[in-house]
């Protein structure tokens, strides 16, 4: 009996060992795989904006982090984590268990915003005295003083002998107060929201808190809103200039132009297609900027596509349908049912747009390697849908489904969980607005500020219809900053739609697709074949007739 049992145990051991080594998807690692735990408190859904901002900030440093609401804290052993970050997004009395867990935690701790005064044992050096308004932030070590677009509320704190690395200047001109304070590995940020530049200040302090010594500036330029009605000659002129300057860049392409009853595809603009191919072969990375960049009756490039801007909500209905509101339903249950059906419609609508866009670009040998939502507006479900097809996302992020006017860009590339595996390459500088005489002055101010942070993206987009001279000014300003130009093709990007697979690595493309991957490509092939066939037939018929006549003679 003993021998049989020992033999059985040996078999189990061998079985487990084989599975552990032969099946990499199965892990038998002990302990928690996450090094950072982010705990947060909220009292309403509006506060999800700051929670998502924090998630985006942490995603710049760590992929292995976990988000958890304070009410779930009793389900986690905090000491499984190397770092714990707490965000008080809303004022709240914390549970005894939550406070005890923080007090007993052995690792590095960072508190942000509300409720920090409840961690008295953990932060005995922190004294929260009240509130104040600030209109500037300062990071002395970075030689940086930055104006706020509006006054912000912060907690007025004193911290005894703790180190102060960030300051705020009071709006009433009465002096400065601490924003970022720490004693050894325990930190506190006194701001009551995380919109930039507060987010940038906290990000800078995260470098010390998370022991990340990365430094450097990344620059990128994106040519925006290139659709089938764009001027190919103007675009070619800019492409040749960027090639001459040896600057890699992105081109945000919209495959279809639509305005009222006018619909133009790339197949109707062969000169533009030739220019886009030239760009792709000479430094450009193609970005899919939606499919039509419009939803209702707006012109391509002006309208939204993946957000119902008129009603400030996700795409729940076909564009031609009268938009139903909450007031159209007698009960909350009926409205919830409408929303569920709307989410199903949105999924089909977006899947169709993404598939069609990739298929049409690929049919012209144009290979998109990242996605950008028109006006950066897209629902949380939208991010899930896009992530099934693209590994890279470009621009800024919409934080919640409550409004599209809640966008955020971190300082550096990030991989927040709500992007479902996609990497964000952020746009941080904005664009040159037509008719704004101070546009370059504003851009240069942003460049100067951004370049003072330890690690940052200096990234802008430019509309080609503004001409070559304006583009040269933007490039000149960016070239004055030390840093590397981002060549997205050098990153690992993956795009998958039905039978089409596009992958980049070290600047090269790997494209897998059937000979004719879509109805669009099939029709394009027939059209091209006819163009070649008709002259050929016209030549062969007279030649054959002449040959027959000569033989009869």
Regions found by a protein language model. Give the residues of each.
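Catalytic grooves of carbohydrate-active enzymes
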Residues: 218-227, 344, 348-351, 355-366, ...
């Amino acid at each position: 009996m003993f021998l049989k049992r020992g033999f059985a145990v040996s078999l189990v051991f061998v079985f487990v060992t084989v599975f552990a080594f032969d099946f990499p998807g199965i892990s038998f690692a002990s302990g928690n795989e996450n090094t950072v735990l982010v705990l947060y408190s909220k009292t309403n859904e509006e506060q999800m904006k700051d929670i998502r901002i924090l998630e985006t900030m942490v995603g710049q440093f760590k992929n292995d982090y976990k988000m958890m609401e304070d009410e779930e804290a009793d389900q986690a052993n905090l000491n499984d984590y190397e770092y714990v970050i707490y965000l008080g997004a809303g004022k709240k009395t914390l549970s005894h268990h939550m406070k005890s867990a923080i007090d007993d935690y052995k690792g590095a701790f960072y508190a942000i915003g509300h409720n920090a005064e409840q961690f008295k044992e953990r932060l005995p050096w922190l004294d929260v005295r009240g509130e104040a308004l600030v209109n500037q932030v300062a990071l002395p070590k970075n030689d940086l003083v930055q104006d706020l677009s509006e006054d912000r509320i912060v907690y007025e704190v004193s911290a005894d002998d703790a180190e102060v690395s960030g300051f705020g200047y009071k709006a009433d001109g009465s002096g400065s107060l601490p924003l970022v304070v720490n004693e050894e590995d325990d930190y506190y940020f006194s701001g009551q929201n995380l919109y930039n530049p507060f987010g940038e200040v906290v990000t800078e302090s995260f470098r010390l808190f998370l022991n990340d010594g990365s430094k450097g500036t990344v620059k990128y330029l994106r040519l925006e809103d290139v659709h089938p009605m764009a001027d190919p000659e103007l675009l070619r002129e800019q492409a040749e200039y960027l090639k001459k300057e040896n600057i890699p860049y992105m081109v945000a392409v919209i495959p279809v132009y639509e305005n009222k009853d006018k619909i133009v595809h790339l197949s109707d603009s062969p000169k533009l297609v030739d220019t886009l191919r030239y760009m792709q072969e000479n430094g450009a990375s193609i970005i899919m900027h939606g499919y039509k960049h419009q939803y209702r009756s707006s012109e391509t490039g002006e309208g939204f596509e993946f957000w119902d801007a008129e009603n400030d909500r996700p795409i729940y209905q076909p564009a031609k349908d009268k938009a139903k509101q909450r007031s159209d339903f007698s009960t909350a249950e009926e409205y919830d049912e409408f929303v569920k059906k709307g989410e199903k419609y949105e999924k089909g609508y977006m899947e169709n747009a993404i598939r069609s866009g990739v298929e049409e670009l690929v049919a012209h040998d144009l290979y998109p390697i990242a996605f950008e939502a028109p006006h950066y507006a897209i629902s949380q479900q939208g991010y899930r849908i896009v992530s099934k097809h693209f590994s890279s996302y470009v621009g800024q992020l919409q934080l919640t489904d409550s409004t599209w006017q809640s966008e955020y860009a971190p300082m550096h590339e990030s991989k927040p969980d709500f992007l479902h595996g996609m990497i964000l390459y952020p746009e941080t500088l904005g664009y040159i607005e037509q008719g704004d005489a101070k546009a370059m002055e504003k851009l240069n101010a942003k460049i100067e500020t951004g370049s003072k942070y330890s690690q940052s993206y200096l990234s802008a987009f430019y509309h080609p219809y503004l001409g070559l001279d304006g583009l040269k000014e933007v490039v000149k300003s960016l070239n004055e900053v030390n840093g590397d130009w981002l060549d997205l093709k050098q990153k690992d990007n993956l795009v998958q739609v039905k039978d089409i697979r596009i992958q980049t690595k070290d600047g090269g493309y790997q494209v897998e697709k059937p000979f004719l991957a879509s109805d669009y490509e099939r029709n394009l092939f027939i059209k091209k074949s006819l163009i070649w066939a008709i002259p050929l037939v016209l030549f062969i018929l007279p030649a054959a007739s002449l040959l027959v006549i000569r033989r009869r003679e």
